[in-house]
Amino acid sequence: MPSLSVVPLMPPWLRWLCGLVLAIALGVGLCRLIAESLWFHQLGYLEVVWQRWSVQALLFLAVAGVSQLFYGCQQQWLLRQRTVTLDPALRAQSTYRGLGLWQLLLCAGSLNWLLIVATYHIGAIALQLWQQRSEMTFNSPLLPQLSVWRVAELSLQMVQTPWLLGLSLVAVILGLWLPVGLFQGLGILLSLAMGAIASLSWPVVLKGLFAASDPHTEPLFRHSISFYLFQIPLWELLRLWLVNLSVVGLGGTTLGYLLANESLSHGKFLGFVRSQRRHLQGLSAFVFATVALSFWLERYKLLYSTKGAAFGAGYTDVTVRLPLYGWLSASAFGVACLLAWSAIRRGGEQRRLGPIAPGLFGFTLGYLGVILIVDWLLPTAIEAAIVQPNQLQRELPYIQRTITHTREGFNLEKMRVEPFQPENNLNAEILAANAATTRNIRLWDTRPLLETNRQLQQLRSYYRFPAAFLDRYSLKLAPDQDQSEIRQVLIAAREVDYSAVQQFARSWINEHLVFTHGYGFTMSPVNTAEANGLPKYFVRDIGDTGQLLVNPPQIRESISFFYPRIYYGELTNTYIFVPSEVPELDFPRGTENVYNHYDGTGGVPIASWWRRLVYSVYFRDWQLLLTPNLRPDSRVLFRRLIQDRVRAIAPFLRFDSEPYLVVADPRSEQEIAPRPSTAGVNYLYWMIDAYTVSRYYPYSDPGEHSFNYIRNSVKVVVDAYNGDVTFYVVEPEDVMIRTWQRIFPTLFHPLSAMPHQLYRHIRYPIDLLQVQSEQLLKYHMSDPVVFYNREDLWQIPKEIYREKPQAVAPYYLITKLPIGATEEFILLVPFTPVNRPNLIGWLAARSDGENYGKLLLYVFPKQELVFGPEQMEARINQDPVISQQISLWNRQGSRSVQGNLLIIPIQRSLLYVEPIYLEADQNRLPTLARVIVMDNQRIVMAPTLEEALKQLFPQ
């Protein structure tokens, strides 16, 4: 019989197969690494991504390696101690009764189940982080910790999932048969999963290590805000690792000792010998040390409590839970020290049988009982007996903390609050003095404009207008006009959508070589329409020479947009190879097409055979290797969706849902990118707002959001032709962006480096103001007594759109604020009291120049009745002339659509404007039919805004 040392582990063919699979996997991984590196290098961010990848690899190797080393040491010690032979005489002399068969099965089965639940727990977290790796929650991941309650929750979830239950039962049976094998297998899985969690949590680690200081402190522990934003998440990650490491180590080792010496066959477990007890005591000390760490961290988590009268630590948290958590932490640490001393001290009978440690089981049960009392019974009793009878007095200082820190977390503490006493004295003279406001009142909503664009401006079936963007431009509109005037316009990019190409025309060449880019855009004034009710266009169509058509011609003196090709946009989801031997479709001209070749700097050169091989593997596209259509100067352009592009570079930022197109000529002043460019002329850029967010700002109430801290700290500019991406810091005082600047010093640029022609188009983001306005509904109340009684709750009013009520969204307008010297571009949202329709105030976010980012809250006197949107909608529906006309339209094969109701502040008065669109039942082409204009007393409807204003305010 051959010795085991010469028996092959596997047949040769299987070794070759495994080697081949491993080689293919390594080859694919290497190709992906090279492809991504070339992409980042072309953009100038190779150093940034290599730093990130290095940290991720180091974290994975360190955490997975240390975890496996720990488990491996426990398993080796376990295997050595399992061979201890028990003397029959020693068994007879032992006073320890041990465990009977059923007790042994119960203990072993429970330990098996605990190991499986712990593995499932870590695996679920790793999977969740992988799925959320490009989302905002990835920046501050919420890590559920392993606890008694978590084990119960996961057990219930596993029992209710048939395949999980079946797999778990098989693992339990396997653990009873091969306990050490199960421990080894689960140890490997847990090590890999924890390594993955650490690697995916690289932002948490880097922020914790490179945290910038913040002068602000919270009032309970007096720690810097930086400690909570950066250190607490890092400690939570460390806690997750250590708790699972210790629990699985103790559980797996205990299981191995319980089932040693054929205890199941004998139907009895006689006890642990001294060496086994010392091993288990050391592991128990590790467990209690992690328990001490957990309760130490739970003290800080009281700052995010939801159990009091307001968010954050309340009276019961501070007076009861805080000291008891400290006691629990100290006592657990004391037990850990005693167990560690017991494990390392010498002496005692090495073969004496007994439990792990006398009294440890009873102490653990008592400790769990104390936890139950501390977490539920005692706080509930204190709350009912002491707090509830005098809750306002008890909770008052803590409510004030919540108000202050919530306003800080959502950047509302610098908001300026002003009274707004409505004068209701609008007249023709005042309107003439505010002509810049009235000529920029928005009549066209984005939805009807896009519908019109899709029918009139798409030109071909493969073009799309995915969105329309509101912005302001300085334009010359008349030949004799000396100076430009600020006009609010709607811009929509004409992008190519390959999914809209006819099925018979789809081919590899068309997808990757021909349909490569969109062309042009439309620009419409917001306040007027043509005589037939269709939108008026400043910029439209595509001329025979490729120039966009403009009206009036003076527009060309204000905006440069020659050959506006869009290679990077919101619909560009294909990878392309340009230039190539196959001409690219440039733009349609009548019944024919005009073709072109890309001459920009975007993309990765792909002429060499090895780069073709790399990218054919990367894209899983074998035709790339075989095509004869590539040239020596061909480049591959991929990741062309602008959202994907910026996320790949800075996945730790949260990006706004609405990138917007800017038409500008920054090269007349300086380069858009900090490196030389030889690109062809381009004037189209995408601007994207980026946010730093966290859920760890102390005492800050997140409301309905997954974060309680947000700053619009970064503006991102993407070249629509060359694909260059530049990050500009808008809010340098933000502690989170200062931390990221310390981590990636070459990634960000100061706002002063942004070309002026682009800087003029930065705007306060709608997403941010929506979040802030939602928080302001409750947290505008600065008096804690008023806040506690909910005396002055606000709400976002509703308007009627397409016959359905909807919340009024923040909207842009150009107006002169009561404290302003000139008209400016602002973002406005109105408020009404809860359950009351009258207007109570409005919030304005400023976007121009040095006033960018400043918030102004105008509050109406409570005794003054100011009509809100719902009341104005009711007035429209009740007006006999208007309702009769709308009914007539609806009976004539058409349908009237009420647009957004806008509230326009002009000096100390309010003007209400709502457009009425008309749609035919057949083609659904919306036209502007009427404009309704109102003040506090009168209401008129006319074909144009100018006529309506003249009727409402005659000379």
Curated annotation (Swiss-Prot):
Mode of membrane association: Multi-pass membrane protein
GO cellular component: extracellular region; plasma membrane
Family that this chain belongs to: Belongs to the UPF0182 family.
Keyword check for Transmembrane helix: yes
Localization in the cell: Cell membrane
Keywords recorded for this protein, A-Z: Cell membrane, Membrane, Transmembrane, Transmembrane helix
Name of the featured protein: UPF0182 protein tll1193
Annotated HAMAP family: UPF0182
Lineage per the UniProt record: Bacteria, Bacillati, Cyanobacteriota, Cyanophyceae, Acaryochloridales
TM helices/strands, residue ranges: 6-26, 53-73, 98-118, 163-183, 186-206, 240-260, 280-300, 324-344, 354-374
UniProt key word Hydrolase: no
Main location: membrane
InterPro entries: UPF0182 (IPR005372)
